[in-house]
Amino acid sequence: MDKVLAKPADLCCLKGEIHTGEPTGSVKQIDGIDTYVAKPQPGKENGHILLFFPDAFGLHINCFLMMDAFAQCGYVTLGVDYFVGDPISKYSYNPLNDPNFDFESWKDKHLHASEEAAARWVKAVKAEYATSDTVKFAAVGYCWGARFVTHQLSAEGICQVGAIAHPSFLNESDVFGVKEPIFLSVPAKDNLFEDEQRTRTVEILTQESGRFNMQIFSNVGHGFASRGRLTDPYERWAKEQHFKSFVDWFDFWLGNK
């Protein structure tokens, strides 16, 4: 039996703050799928590619700003619209207070379709961006996107390192399949990724001799890394710390330091 580690996305995935800023990337299509492309400043490139798998809000301002920030750290960052134009942000930025939005139906529609779109997209990304043996791939995923990172860290994936924050839809098989270094950034209290399942995740990675690290923040909720309240000093700090930790993790394993 493939036991659940992180439960399916729930109402906690619909909370959080929408951030403000001016994105600097652009959108193009890769195998017919909209892709946000954030590039480093000239001369700052490290030669590697970061795949960005968003939460249920899809490609929206919070993601754009994070991808731009990853790019400023040297990574050409590619964000995938695996909801194919139908993310939650299409309907509302405050879906908890929108009586017309049916989250359960939306999840049913996109659970497997997003997996298929992501797999097709990754294959096309590799064909376009793996231009030499020196190009390496990393992956980052938030909530809905976490399991896609584990897929890309498996024997069938293309990534050499990955990181996830506050995962959902994560089963034991996803973690058993991880063969490359993985970093997890999670809240101390998360109804989707509870203490027992968090401990089990560490047990599996340890049992499999995995290269991993887990960062646990108290007093933040599910979604803090992607939709944290920037007006709250501690929550802003936690969000910034998760980002710095992810970049350091990528840099270490990809030989940028």
Outline where the language-model segments fall:
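N-terminal cap/leader regions of alpha/beta-hydrolase-fold enzymes
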Residues: M1-K257
